[in-house]
Amino acid sequence: MPKGFLVKRNRKSPPVSYRVREDEENRGESLPGWMLLATMCPTGGAPPPSSPERLASAAPSCNNPRPPPAGQFGNPEAVPQTLYSPTRPVSREQRERKYLGSPVSAESFPGLGSSSEALLFPPTSTANGHHGLALLPPVSSSSSISRTHGKRPAPEPDVKAGAAPGTACKPPAAKKTKAIRKLTFEDEVTTSPVLGLKIKEGPVEPPRPRAPSSGPRPLGEFICQLCKEEYSDPFSLAQHKCSRIVRVEYRCPECHKVFSCPANLASHRRWHKPRPPAVPAVQPKEEALSDRDTPSPESGSEDGLYECPRCARKFRRQAYLRKHLLSHQVTKEPEEAGHMMYQSDEQRPQAKSPPSLNVPQECHPCPVCGETFPGKSSQERHIRLLHSSQLYPCKYCPATFYSSPGLTRHINKCHPSENRQVILLQVPVRPAC
């Protein structure tokens, strides 16, 4: 028996906390054999006085002429003493509880108990009267049972928690790659839609026998896999232009431009489609005013392609014409402002000047004959020269009007204080009372 195999207990209990259950009390026979033998037949001590039944059952085994196991190895210190306290009586139930619930007996030396089973328990029969030793289970089974009182056994890693213990885990199925589907199309193998190349079908020929060469054969065979032509070095094979590889060209039927990809040709042909015509500008209501006798000095150049239907101005681009037409749709001034004319630009009051627009100048029609002019100065010059007899000047300001109602509205609006004084002067003065 190796040294230190039997545990020497002290009087002070070890600081180990454990629970004793009722089902453990009924398992008195599941004690390890070496613990039961050490307690029943100690070498240097007497059995406890409070257990007469255990003393009577252990008497035949103590009279056995075989020497005690501790004496075989010459280690008298390893013999365990009786496990009872001298200060208080020890009963049978307390001893069984101490041995059943002791973690040392179950956990300390589980492996050494099975190796020393042949030394402690020789084969005996029930005929000799050793009923206690014959009914004991093997040490390996008892140690496995008592081992369950301690720590929880770790679960097996191969068995899942929800699966049955007999079924084994299946390995995860491998994912199918998408490259398998691409190999089923023959066009993708023989045609390159990006490079515009295609491999022609070659004649099926039996493999030609290899000609014996006198010189040393290179490690790799430099043979074209399509036309089966052999080359002496890889550089010659790389420069080889195989006759089975043809270039596919996609030509535009309208401009004869060549493309190597059909998608590029389809994208190019969209430019040849006729675009829908642009929506024509809204025709103004007054189309009669577009005719002019003399060209305007402020109109566009003679090379212009787009002409304004109102003022006959010409523009190089249609966008400029659309922007110019917006200026004709601006709300007009009040009616009296159309009949108002100043003799010169210096005499025009700044307060009554129309707001400036960031658009080209609009045409100014003559209020008498209806002729249009591109600028205000041209209109005033025309009125002074041709319609000077039909003018109604204001006597309070240098403004001139073409009608009597227009002059009256102007006086009532712009000169109400002077007009009131004139009215008061015309009223006869009453004599004082």
From Swiss-Prot:
Matching Pfam families: zf-C2H2
Keywords noted in UniProt: Developmental protein, Differentiation, DNA-binding, Metal-binding, Neurogenesis, Nucleus, Repeat, Transcription, Transcription regulation, Zinc, Zinc-finger
Transmembrane parts of this sequence: none
Species the sequence originates in: Xenopus laevis
Compartment list: Nucleus
Biased composition (Low complexity): 160-172
UniProt-listed InterPro entries: INSM1/2 (IPR042972), Znf_C2H2_sf (IPR036236), Znf_C2H2_type (IPR013087)
Biological role: May act as a transcriptional regulator. Plays a role in noradrenergic neuron, pancreatic and gastrointestinal endocrine cells differentiation during embryonic development.
Comp. bias intervals (Basic and acidic residues): 19-28, 90-99, 284-295
C2H2-type ZnF: 250-272, 306-328, 364-387, 392-415
Biological process, per Gene Ontology: endocrine pancreas development; endodermal cell differentiation; gland development; negative regulation of transcription by RNA polymerase II; neuron differentiation; pancreatic A cell differentiation; regulation of cell cycle process; transdifferentiation
GO-annotated cellular components: nucleus; transcription repressor complex
GO molecular function terms attached to this record: chromatin DNA binding; DNA-binding transcription factor activity; DNA-binding transcription repressor activity, RNA polymerase II-specific; RNA polymerase II cis-regulatory region sequence-specific DNA binding; zinc ion binding
Region (Disordered): 1-111, 131-175, 269-305
UniProt xrefs under Gene3D superfamilies: Classic Zinc Finger
Compositionally biased intervals (Basic residues): 1-12
Family stated for the protein in its record: Belongs to the INSM1 family.
SMART domains to which the protein is assigned, alphabetical: ZnF_C2H2
The protein, known as: Insulinoma-associated protein 1
Gene that encodes the chain: insm1
Residues covered by region (SNAG domain): 1-20
Primary location group: nucleus
Record keyword tRNA-binding present: no
